[in-house]
């Protein structure tokens, strides 16, 4: 499963793993959309292996036990895990998100 998540996370400059109906997922994808980023979005509750992928994302976000909070949204930029909602919003408010997106080729501003 780790290889599958890594492959999906690297398919585009920005990849977001979400669940339909998740308000925090909507907040992150809306922010990226407002920045004119075309992210690949994978809704785990609509993926055949979504539960397994969610466990792998939780492991990546919170360590080997995979416990500590929600696994979605999980945002990857340039193939690297940035984090969930709080991390994405923090780097955005610090002015670091746009440079990350530019570096990954997701923005041309």
Swiss-Prot record:
**Domain Glutaredoxin: from-to ranges:** 2-108
**PROSITE patterns attached to this UniProt entry:** GLUTAREDOXIN_2
What's the chief localization of this chain? Answer: cytoplasm
A Pfam family it matches? Glutaredoxin
Location of the protein in the cell: Cytoplasm; Nucleus
Please report any disulfide bonds recorded for this protein chain, giving both cysteine positions. Answer: 22-25
Q: Which UniProt keywords apply?
A: Cytoplasm, Disulfide bond, Electron transport, Nucleus, Redox-active center, Transport
Sequence motif: Responsive for interaction with TGA factors, positions: 106-109
Q: Which InterPro entries match?
A: GlrX-like_pln_2 (IPR011905), Glutaredoxin (IPR002109), Glutaredoxin_subgr (IPR014025), Thioredoxin-like_sf (IPR036249)
Cellular component aspect of the GO annotation: cytoplasm; nucleus
Gene3D superfamilies given in the database record: Glutaredoxin
Asked whether the keyword Electron transport is assigned, the reply is yes
Question: What's this protein's function?
Answer: Has a glutathione-disulfide oxidoreductase activity in the presence of NADPH and glutathione reductase. Reduces low molecular weight disulfides and proteins.
Task: Name the NCBIfam families on file.
Answer: GlrX-like_plant (TIGR02189)
Family statement drawn from the similarity comment of this UniProt entry: Belongs to the glutaredoxin family. CC-type subfamily.
Q: What is this protein called?
A: Putative glutaredoxin-C12
């Amino acid at each position: 499963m780790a290889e599958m998540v890594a492959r999906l996370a690297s398919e585009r400059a920005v990849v977001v793993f979400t669940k339909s109906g998740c308000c925090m997922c909507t907040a992150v994808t809306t922010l990226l959309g407002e920045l004119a980023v075309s992210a690949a979005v994978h809704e785990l509750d609509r993926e055949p292996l979504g539960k397994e992928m969610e466990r792998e994302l939780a492991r990546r976000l919170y360590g080997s036990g995979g416990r500590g909070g929600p696994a979605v949204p999980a945002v990857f930029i340039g193939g690297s895990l940035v984090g969930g909602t709080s991390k994405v919003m923090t780097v955005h408010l610090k002015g670091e998100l746009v440079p990350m997106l530019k570096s990954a080729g997701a923005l041309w501003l």
